[in-house]
């Protein structure tokens, strides 16, 4: 089973700040996907196949990486971006998720 380790577990960013969340895999993976979850809702697909934005995701989000190291970046933090972000990989037949990164607004 491939283990995904996210960093940081919790972070706070000021509005307009650049934010980067990393996801490290215990073995090389071909693709990494990201989900956004807000309080009281199910996780939504956010970035798929490393860098492709899901429908409706703002262009300030981007994804990158290869092998065992991947990241999600927000170029300029907005209030609506406060959420929990999860990385996810599918290594047939197992799907594994990271433990999540909680992104808060720094006030």
Curated annotation (Swiss-Prot):
Residues 56-87 are annotated as: Framework-3. GO terms for cellular component: immunoglobulin complex. Keywords: Adaptive immunity, Disulfide bond, Immunity, Immunoglobulin. Residues 97-106 are annotated as: Framework-4. Transmembrane segments: none annotated. It comes from the Eukaryota. Residues 88-96 are annotated as: Complementarity-determining-3. GO terms for biological process: adaptive immune response; immune response. Residues 49-55 are annotated as: Complementarity-determining-2. Disulfide bonds join 23-87. Residues 34-48 are annotated as: Framework-2. Residues 24-33 are annotated as: Complementarity-determining-1. It holds the Pfam family V-set. Residues 1-23 are annotated as: Framework-1. This chain was isolated from a myeloma protein that bind galactan. This is Ig kappa chain V-VI region XRPC 24.
């Amino acid at each position: 089973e491939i283990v995904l380790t996210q960093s940081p577990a919790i972070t706070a960013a000021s509005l307009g700040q650049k934010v980067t969340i990393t996801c490290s895999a215990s073995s090389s993976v071909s693709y990494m996907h990201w989900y956004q979850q807000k309080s009281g809702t199910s996780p939504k697909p956010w970035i798929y196949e490393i860098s492709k934005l899901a429908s409706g995701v703002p262009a300030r989000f981007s994804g990158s990486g290869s092998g065992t190291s991947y990241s999600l970046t927000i170029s300029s933090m907005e209030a609506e971006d406060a959420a929990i972000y999860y990385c996810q990989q599918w290594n047939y037949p197992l799907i594994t998720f990271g433990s999540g990164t909680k992104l808060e607004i720094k006030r």
